[in-house]
Amino acid sequence: MLLQESAGVWLALALVTALTPSPSMAVPWQDCTGAECPLLENCIEEALEPGACCATCVQQGCACEGYQYYDCVQGGFVDGRVPAGQSYFVDFGSTECSCPPGGGKISCQFMLCPELPPNCIEAVVVADSCPQCGQVGCVHSGRKYAAGHTVHLSSCRACHCPDAGGELICYQLPGCHGNFSDAEEGDSERQYEDPYSYDQEVAEAEATTAIVNEVQAGAEGPPAALGGGNLPPSSIRVTPWPVALPRPTAAAALGPPAPVQAKARRVTLDTEEDEEEEEEETLVTEPPTAGSPGRLDSLPTRSPARPGFPVQEKEAEAKAGPEENLIPDAQVTPRSVMQEGAAPLPRSGLAALSPSLATDSSSEDPVKPSDHPTLSTLPPDRAQVSPSPETPEEIPQHPQLLPRFRAEEDIDPNSVHSVPRGDLDGSTKDLIETCCAAGQQWAIDNDECQEIPENGAQSDICRIAQRQCCISYLKEKSCVAGVMGAKEGETCGAEDNDTCGVSLYKQCCDCCGLGLRVRAEGQSCESNPNLGYPCNHVMLSCCEGEEPLIVPEVRRPPEPEAAPRRVSEMEMASREALSLGTEAELPNSLPGDDQDECLMLPGELCQHLCINTVGSYRCACFPGFELQGDGRTCRPDRGAPQLDTARESAPRSESAQVSPNTIPLPVPQPNTCKDNGPCRQVCRVVGDTAMCSCFPGYAIMADGVSCEDQDECLMGTHDCSWKQFCVNTLGSFYCVNHTVLCAEGYILNAHRKCVDINECVTDLHTCTRAEHCVNTPGSFQCYKALTCEPGYVLTDGECTDVDECVTGTHNCQAGFSCQNTKGSFYCQARQRCMDGFLQDPEGNCVDINECTSLLEPCRSGFSCINTVGSYTCQRNPLVCGRGYHANEEGSECVDVNECETGVHRCGEGQLCYNLPGSYRCDCKPGFQRDAFGRTCIDVNECWVSPGRLCQHTCENTPGSYRCSCAAGFLLAADGKHCEDVNECETRRCSQECANIYGSYQCYCRQGYQLAEDGHTCTDIDECAQGAGILCTFRCVNVPGSYQCACPEQGYTMMANGRSCKDLDECALGTHNCSEAETCHNIQGSFRCLRFDCPPNYVRVSETKCERTTCQDITECQTSPARITHYQLNFQTGLLVPAHIFRIGPAPAFAGDTISLTITKGNEEGYFVTRRLNAYTGVVSLQRSVLEPRDFALDVEMKLWRQGSVTTFLAKMYIFFTTFAP
């Protein structure tokens, strides 16, 4: 019974292996093993549908690579991916980068600014962006009208601007019977303006005669548009010389004046061909505003009087278009109004102004000039003018219309003033140009743009142009100053007076410093568009060594007139001898192309003043004189007030003291300044003596009458800096920046030529006292002092013969001639003179001038020409004007081709074009005249149109420009755009290359990494980076990858290529165990075990033996009822303590108790038994096994159940190996 119960007890064994847990297996939706998914090209968003093995593309597009990523983020694509068909802008909106349809690579295209629509009247310009149209409307006669508005151009005329802009729609108001003529039409006879015509002429406000218009009897006062009341003739005063002007002690600036004097309107008196009587002129007066005396809003207008022209039509024209006469902010000199009974003004091209100050009988100080002249504004009486050829023409007693002026300015009576043309009938371009020049001049004079005076008559265009050009000039000026400061090593600090933030001094100084540093390091000068304008351009200019230049205003050629002006025969006759070609013959001439005849032939063309005009010149007279019929000479003005009478009634003042450069005439005469006396320029009466003086820039000559130019450059009275050289002109000078560097031993003269320095004269040599200095070109030489014999002199280190006959050191008597010899001379008797010669007192034969000694050597029509010993009679040649010469037959005058004969004065780099009687100098394409209009300078197109000519970098070249691209780009065929270079085609990368916009990126295949040079790929040692992670046994690195290896015996590589699988030699039959042995597989090997049952036991299974019989109870209790064999495999280094075997009865009953004992194999104490509870025990490892080792343990378990004891034996074979998969 006990045996049966014991036989029914089963042992439950458990192996504790915490190191190898069993993972839970997840069941997929679908088995996708071996499925191949297609490559999704240009896909930026994927999606995997339920049940599918491959993802599908939801959105195609372009991936932003490199620096493009930041542009994409700025453009709104935060993930760095641009959907197909969408784009973004970079470089301040000048370049559009887009992703093509279907995705791929991003391409960028430079965009030029679109043209504004023609009906745009207001452009909105955003910083670093293209201009956009802010408002549409209509432009009529230079004025802008908003769309949808209706305006009244006259009392009987209204015009409407359509909603879409375009042309004004005008109509006559019903019930109105006024003149319907277009009062807004421009003056068809408006003269051409030359912005660079720096001529010797007086200011327009002082050089033009007051123009008078006939007023018919019965007229009811002046037109309403002109203002003012009625003024009796007795209230009209005459001021012979303008009150606000200084005494005329200065001549006109004959040289190139300042840019403010670059524009002067010329007023010419045009006559109809069929009218022989002279024009009548009108003076219109508008009262000055309170608080600003002397400032009016109009200039005199001209209206020729024709028969049958009614007064009502003239008044209607004046009422309909008062704007025609307005010139905003005209900086001119006010004219005075004539007194009753005063002599009429002359009919010359210049005002008959007297160099005397105005007097007023009602003033306490009759000689003190008024700082702010006042005008009478009562309406004039009606008067009729009847010109007569025998008597001077009477001028109606009308008040003049005085233009605006600035009384505090010091105005030269003969200087060229800038009169901006505010004629609203002109084109918008002309208005912008003239107002822009006024804004630049305000910046030059005041160095600020906040206090520009505003005039109600000015249009918005003029105000905007003035302010923008003023600010632009100050910015360019401060930028140039910053560049110069950087080059001179100054600290780049902000300007203290920059309260408006328009100064670019610090920015340009800093940016120039960057360019200078790059240049000092010897690096190449490359543009960096990211610096922006103007920093990038200034940096590049300083790096390349270019000088900054404020580019003069670029002017377009004038459009030809609709029809040539008709000139009367009388006027043509007075001009024929002076003109070098009419303006009608120069339709293609540019401003500044005119040859200044007054400067070419000073003092030869006119008696007093020479005024240059486009293609010709004209003569004018000093105050108190009028031009005669020949157009050259001047005669005293019979109608002008006498100077002596005006001065006799006025006490002396300090201003009438004699200037230091005046010389009194030796013989004083009463009334000596009548008709300007003997003086060439200015005559003054001091006591009873006529004193002649000169204008500034001139000095009185020894004769006390004439004036000669003072060379300020030689006298050292100029104010040119050390960076400039002085160029003298008639009466003035100007400074020019140095652009020519002379070699050592040479110096730059006033003509900008390098001339030799005479070191011997300037004491710059190093010769000793015993040596003689001899100057050589660019240097000098020192020679030892020599002693020459009599008759010789030391010259250039050598003794040369002295010509006593030439030096006059001979002693030959009368009748003898001196003959020079080497070192001496001799006297030779003279011979008798032949016919035609006469012996002088010294015995020489001199020629007899028969042309002067004979009474009539030649008959009429021939000229006497003296010859040596005789004379000849020659027919008088044909007298031709300048620019013409007689032909070979002497029958007619033909044009001189100055361009072919080389007598022109065109500068280097200019083109000469022959004209009838003259020639013209033009600049080559890409060049323009400088601010003085004398030389051609290169146009820096890159500064004129920054950021619009080239996509990347604009480089200025002489006469043109060229575009260049940044690294990674090539210039396109159009020479402006830049195309990306595909660097991958040149195989710059060792493995994979990806081209990106403006650059490229090298990539490496899997298993390689990019080296520091960015081009080479090096192998990645995966085994060193992932030690112990990649492979379970050993990792072997190979090029581009790695391989896992297993021990040479006992293992094989698994399908994953990383893990090693133990070879079961027992299952494979590769063991060498005998038939009596049992093969047991262990990690990497096997063991041959022999399971034999002892006597009295029978084998019930391969590993179990049971006892058969038992002789007595004691034997049954001591001998095991069953012997079981167990094989256990463990890895060395197992953490201790570790339960390796659990034993107990199965099934267990209440009251069961067990005990465990290791009876064999634990001599070293590696193992220990322990009871977990009454019926369960474990075998534990208490010492760590560090080396491979085999143990054979006998573990005996005794079971107490219901008072009996049963023994069980467990034979355990424990194997510790070094590696386990």
Swiss-Prot record:
Residues 1-26 form the signal peptide. InterPro entries: Anaphylatoxin/fibulin, cEGF, ECM_structural_protein, EGF-like_Ca-bd_dom, EGF-like_dom, EGF-type_Asp/Asn_hydroxyl_site, EGF_Ca-bd_CS, FIBL-2_dom. It comes from Mus musculus. GO terms for molecular function: calcium ion binding; extracellular matrix binding. It is found in: Secreted, Extracellular space, Extracellular matrix. Pfam families: ANATO, cEGF, EGF_CA, FIBL-2, Fibulin_C, FXa_inhibition. GO terms for biological process: positive regulation of cell-substrate adhesion. This is Fibulin-2. Residues 248-329, 341-399, 633-661 are annotated as: Disordered. Residues 27-176 are annotated as: Subdomain NA (Cys-rich). SUPFAM superfamilies: EGF/Laminin, Growth factor receptor domain. It comes from the Eukaryota. Residues 1111-1221 are annotated as: Domain III. GO terms for cellular component: collagen-containing extracellular matrix; extracellular region. Its main location: secreted. A motif (Cell attachment site) lies at residues 421-423. Residues 177-434 are annotated as: Subdomain NB (Cys-free). Residues 312-322 have a biased composition (Basic and acidic residues). Its binding to fibronectin and some other ligands is calcium dependent. May act as an adapter that mediates the interaction between FBN1 and ELN. Residues 27-434 are annotated as: N. Disulfide bonds join C435-C462, C436-C469, C449-C470, C479-C508, C492-C509, C511-C535, C512-C542, C525-C543, C598-C610, C606-C619, C621-C634, C673-C683, C679-C692, C694-C707, C713-C726, C720-C735, C742-C754, C805-C818, C812-C827, C833-C845, C899-C912, C906-C921, C923-C936, C942-C954, C950-C963, C965-C978, C984-C993, C989-C1002, C1004-C1017, C1023-C1035, C1031-C1044, C1046-C1060, C1066-C1079, C1073-C1088, C1093-C1105.
